[in-house]
Design a protein with these regions (language model features):
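Glycan-processing catalytic domains of CAZymes
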Residues: 1-344
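ER/Golgi luminal nucleotide-sugar-dependent glycosyltransferases, focusing on the catalytic module
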Residues: 316, 325-381
Length: 381
């Protein structure tokens, strides 16, 4: 309330977003779950049930830690206290400074990171209860921890060493450290980490096609990219010199957070997403060790960035359906297809055919007179 105004949530930006150019899909409005409140236990129960129903194995939660101070911790604590939410989970430390970046004020820091050897130890101690949870994701028997911007750590290698020593002291077999491939090129050996996880749209060599679109907002200064081109290329990429976890995104558009200045991917559809996911699954399935056959989706519910598997009013369950259909080729869950068929059987079929009328002809013109209507020799509306 102090920083953003009383009652502000992500939904504030999501609901007021508007189209910035012709064909721009905004706003992204939620479907089944509505404008939910994550402080309510029943909401998280719905999310877990929905994810499991469509074959998703776990959630990666952002963890906000600023020199001992936590933010947005209530949903995570609620999850830990409810073992009935039977789905895997892990943490990604969002280790940036907390700033007013949504307003475009990059230097207006609200809460800064505070790094020290003592804070490294305190950070691991704060995570210990989650690491002990049987639902927590482990790789080679070690709890997995992702760091969003490893290059921001003053001495990442020293921090990694302290973390490894501390988890051993706490009785764990070690820790599996993963650097997110965000703003910097990552060499895990340099930072003392074990693996890298892709984080599209970061580090993706995007194709800018902004000039192909007509702006609706004359002050629009955002960027428009081709999702389909990215999906065809990025899903097949792999590296042999370090362990790389693949990540797929269903779509992306952060204009809700940065009106008129966002980055938007067009041509994002469930079909294109499914093809990207299938490519990433093929790469992941080739891993020699089962624990390394792990794949991420960005994201489950980043509504203000247009990246969500949760149902919306445009696509409904199509992205979840596409996810389940692709995973069913690789995921050893014999009941997944049965659940998918049962879910789809519940939809009401309203039409047997779709009629598409092309209304653009050379002899078609717009006439004003008591109202607007289109007219041609053969068609009048």
């Amino acid at each position: 309330d102090e920083w953003w105004g009383k009652g502000f949530t992500e939904w504030t930006n999501v609901s007021k977003a508007t189209a910035q150019f012709v064909g721009h899909y905004q706003p992204h409005l939620p479907g089944e779950l509505g404008f939910y409140d994550l402080r309510l236990p029943e909401v998280m129960r719905q999310q877990v049930d929905l994810a499991k129903h469509f074959g998703i194995g776990g959630f990666c939660f952002y963890y906000y830690w600023f020199g001992g101070r936590r933010l947005l911790e209530r949903p995570l604590q609620m999850f830990l206290e409810n073992p009935g939410l039977d789905i895997g989970f892990c943490y990604c430390w969002a280790n940036e400074n907390w700033s007013r970046r949504w307003d475009g004020l990059e230097d207006s820091i609200l809460l800064a990171q505070q790094h020290s050897p003592e804070d490294d130890i305190a950070f691991i101690d704060a995570l210990a209860d989650a690491f002990r949870d049987p639902r927590y994701v482990r790789v080679d028997g070690k709890p997995l921890l992702i760091v969003y911007q490893v290059a921001l750590l003053p001495d990442a290698a020293a921090t990694a060493q302290r973390w490894r020593r501390r988890v051993i002291e706490l009785g764990f077999d070690g820790i599996h450290l993963v650097a997110a491939k965000t703003f910097d090129m990552i060499d895990v050996s340099r930072y003392g980490f074990d693996a890298v996880v892709e984080f599209p749209p970061h580090q993706t060599a995007m194709q800018d096609i902004s000039g192909e679109f007509q702006a609706l907002n004359l002050e629009f200064r955002g960027r428009i990219y081709d999702f389909e081109e990215l999906a065809k290329r990025f899903g097949k990429e792999d590296r042999s010199d370090q362990l790389l976890y693949k990540t797929v995104m269903p779509s992306w558009d952060n204009d809700a957070r940065k009106p008129g200045a966002g980055h938007t991917f067009v041509n994002a559809t469930p079909r294109v997403y499914a093809a990207w996911l299938a490519d990433a699954c093929r790469v992941t399935a080739s891993r020699a060790l089962p624990d390394h056959r792990m794949l991420f989706v960005n994201a489950w519910n980043e509504w203000a960035e247009g990246a969500h598997l949760e149902p919306d009013r445009r696509w409904g369950y199509a992205y979840l359906d596409a996810t389940a259909r692709v995973l069913s080729r690789y995921y050893r869950d014999p009941e997944l297809n049965d659940r998918l068929q049962a879910h789809n059987a519940g939809f009401v079929k309203r039409h047997d055919a779709a009629v598409v009328v092309h209304l653009y002809f050379e002899d078609l013109y717009l006439k004003a007179g008591g109202g607007y209507y289109f007219y041609s020799d053969t068609l009048k509306l």
